[in-house]
């Protein structure tokens, strides 16, 4: 059989060969036989076949050939025709065993497509359809598919088809619903047999014909999709793309002066309802002219969401049909650019195309802004994008105002839009909401906002008086009308009116879209009526047309485009009318700058700065740039103007958009931000180096700043400040900048000198203060400004002081750097700089924070990302976000991120964020808003990005992302839970009981404190069944589970804590000495209580003794940390935030984590104990830090929580992590986790050791030993507490992020232990510049990576270690321009670990940080350190004795992993 089977092929080959041989020209015959092959190849093939056949068969074939040679040609032909074909019997039998062949499937596929069509009102019986198919196959001799396979093909052809059972009872049949037979069946196209022979002639024609048919089919399908999408977006039916294009042109959604528009309009009368294909082609032509615009517009808005959701075809379609995307995009951007900075030059097709790329947002708004604009702008209507229909140009003034108001929400919307479908819905509503209010409020100013964006820049056509409104930025619409911004401000926090409304605006700044709510908190603070707050929005990504490459990236990356939109929206400048003339100049200058700089920064809108006269002391240039794009792309920053009424030019450079897009368009939801953040960080570091990333459009070309930028490269934080100036010099933008600057100078020399640029470098929010005169504005001025600015006094005293301090050093970039580092340790460094930048923009940040972390989420996250550690943290969330599979996970992720980011920022930000975050849940909180928001942005730079509950761009999380459920209970509650002490303090009572505050019962509000809280009794019983989504949220893992939609059954105890226990917990927290914590005490205690109870019932398979010992540790820790109780509080606060998490099935573990390595490490299969551990070590860490920010703010006074957050978040987080670990994780794991903790702990130790470690000499060893917390009894407990404190920073999983946070935390902690201890009060908030300087010294030490392990352990260098880690992280970030990438890797790794081992990756390694880089050196030192070895041995012993039987018995993989 085998021989026979193999005979035919050789025969076939040979027979043909024979013909050629007999023929004079055999060469010709062979090719004919094998048409595609030349003679040599055919021979080679023949030899190959021959060699593959056995000798006997070859001999047989040779014999046959010899006989065949005797045949005549006719006989040979007959033989050839008679040769058997098809499969051999053996192959046939095999084939039958198979389900079906590709050919059969194709036959069935073609038959189904040619015979059936969709029709919503008819159904076809399945059997009838299959019988027809079978008869068709029988007629043609095909082998029919089985009924099951045929059904699968049917599903592929008609994915929307559903099976229904129709008919009377007893006679029902299964039918395909929505199908019918085609009335006319087209003749199937047959392949062109002459294809090869014809050569070029026919070959070109035939294929082109076929391709054309295919293209037409695809194009028509794409057109259908686009029309369907347009109908949803515009609430108006479109049968063809031509109709849609006509509508878009008619309603001025796009420019009317382009050839495509003219062509469409000319063709419209003839037949609006043209054939779909023609309509498709028309759009194509149209798209060519409009494409840039179209592309740009869609990316920022719903279009993106829609596209993402829809098939790629649709995306192509959108690009094809610029009108559609343009419309959608225009719609959103227009609404966004309320400032009347309609960037779209209506009459300017050429400009339009570049503009769209660079500035999606601006393009849309331009039509609406002004009558003048209207002429220019083709799409005036877009302003009303919320409605889907736009107001006509005629409503220019009102529209513009509406836009500016709307803009704020819009931008956020845009941001969300780019990341996910959730954006579109959000977009729509916010659009609709802002429209009415905005129109009424901002109508007056609208004229100023003339959009000249049609060209990348160009001056505003608006009168000088309206200069302030005018935005020069080509992409950014920066004309926020200062007229009553109250309502508008609410709508668009970013649009803070110059008037007193600014204050309100600060409060309002809730981000409607998760994307960004940049508010001009400062502006509002500045309550100077002239629109003192100039909102300058620089969207780096939007950048200028100049940055086409970048823009392209942005376009390609949806995130980026939205970012641009946001920028346009946010780029609203409120300038006092008095300064109008200058602003206009500046505006132009800025535009030029943008052009000059390839950077993404739009020309800064100096206009705002011009307000100087109006600003007087109050005026703060509030750059409310909201991160329109996903979370990070850019954050709005507001810089308070100098005392001398100078609005610093805050330039928001969002490099992140570009990077971020690349990093994660994903989702990004926030996820995209990660990479961008890293990149941004890198960009910040190397402002000049990365044209795309760096938005060098620094207002002030300060050579001194150049140095700063260099330093910044090392330390992303630093970069933010320093870069601005030097980059300007470096970059072409310089002249433009200079021009801008003169404007600024005109306004006020001091103001000029300190150009405050709010840059979003990468994810980092950079407020670049550039001073034209090197020293003229610098520290003193800055300090003055900070002090003068209302924002400082109002709520953000703490932050402002820090800011001041940093600013004071600003002239000296290094000094600034130093101060920053000192302030925050390594993380603080970044943050500090951001702080400096943000200080002025604190109100904005506050607002953003207020806007429930939306903006902070994005902007701050960026900030943190800038700082290395923070970056890591930030990115983890993003990774998680990218990974997240479900909405729930997304929400959890967001919460996690929020908490984590908050904690990051928090650590960096002196815990101001804490308060801010607190506000996030209650963005409305006006009183706290300014301070809390301020803090929040600062501290939760990273936070908001991932989990911007308010309007998470990436995820649609409720504003109070911090605590969706119990966490959300009350902003104040979450705050109190979140108080820094709360976290760490939590450890004392609750952690003692639970072994870790993270173990707090999920249901309990305090459960946030215990990120690692056992998921809940239910979860404990079946960790896999109900793993908290946020389990890997670092601190808040468990808490998220508890606070989120946890079923009541899940946390029965949480709801009814013992009064005794509550009191005990409260006392413990209060005892920590943090009034704020005490205020929050109940919540934390509640959490602890619940935690304790859950813990006991759950037991997490962790021996009770382990549990007890851990509680002991926590208690001791508490006692030890008492002096630094704020730190502990911070931890608690962090927990609170995390608590927001939802309890979700385990599978979500990895995907949902937004917060840090820990977040990634949700344990899926690991026993509850492991899970707890994980939460503690990996997730808990960051979230703890994060939460504190948000939670603390609402509680009591924003100030205290802030302080607590600063000092406590990191240390507490670490301590808690360790405690939890020891409690529920095997020593091995703990050891592994602890090492990084110990290292970072040491970093933190500097301050902590001073305060606490001084008493814990042995504790230092234990800081390393902390790995095996279970180790011991009271002595160990005390050590454990210390280790927790120290380890907080070093936890590997979140080592980087935590390090950054911890460093800052420890710095502040030590600096202002009294503050920490104090009850909430402004005192805490405002750290004196002296403290900051001290911190800077510490920071310098931290920078010293060479400090030995012992030094770190000693506690003097605790911060040093942190700093080193942070530094390494920043270096890594610099090295890997895409820090987020690395982070993502880590995240993926952690995810893998989670999935594989359900082990906390933190235990194994720190995904949050580039592994082995920063930590490895320290780790090596530790390994060599006798203390460390001792600890390790003790840990191991304790592990064996601790009773990790659960690991042995339940989690073999875990044990193996540990081993």
UniProtKB/Swiss-Prot annotation:
Residues 1-27, 303-347, 404-428, 482-590, 634-659, 688-716, 918-1016 are annotated as: Disordered. Residues 537-549 have a biased composition (Basic and acidic residues). One of its GO terms (biological process) is positive regulation of transcription by RNA polymerase II. Its main location: nucleus. It is found in: Nucleus. SUPFAM superfamilies: Winged helix' DNA-binding domain. Expressed in spleen and lymph node and to a lower extend in brain (at protein level). Expressed in lymphoid organs and lymphoid cell subsets. Expressed throughout natural killer (NK) cell maturation. The keyword Aminoacyl-tRNA synthetase does not apply. It holds the Pfam family RFX_DNA_binding. Residues 12-21, 521-534 have a biased composition (Low complexity). Disruption phenotype: Knockout mice exhibit embryonic lethality with a frequency of 7% instead of the expected 25% pups being born from heterozygous parents, revealing a role in development. Natural killer (NK) lymphocytes exhibit increased size, granularity, proliferation and energetic state. Altered gene expression of genes linked to cell metabolism in NK cells. The keyword Transcription regulation applies. Residues 108-183 bind DNA. PROSITE patterns: RFX_DBD. A motif (PxLPxI/L motif) lies at residues 188-193. Residues 947-963 have a biased composition (Pro residues). One of its GO terms (molecular function) is DNA-binding transcription factor activity. Residues 404-416, 482-502, 562-578, 634-645, 706-716, 971-1009 have a biased composition (Polar residues). Transcription factor. Acts as a transcriptional activator by binding to promoter regions of target genes, such as Rec8, Mxd4 and Ddit4. Plays a role in natural killer (NK) cell maintenance and immunity. May play a role in the process of ciliogenesis in the neural tube and neural tube closure. Belongs to the RFX family. Interacts (via PxLPxI/L motif) with RFXANK (via ankyrin repeats). Interacts (via PxLPxI/L motif) with ANKRA2 (via ankyrin repeats). PANTHER family: DNA-BINDING PROTEIN RFX7 (PTHR12619:SF2), RFX TRANSCRIPTION FACTOR FAMILY (PTHR12619). This is DNA-binding protein RFX7. It comes from Mus musculus (Mouse).
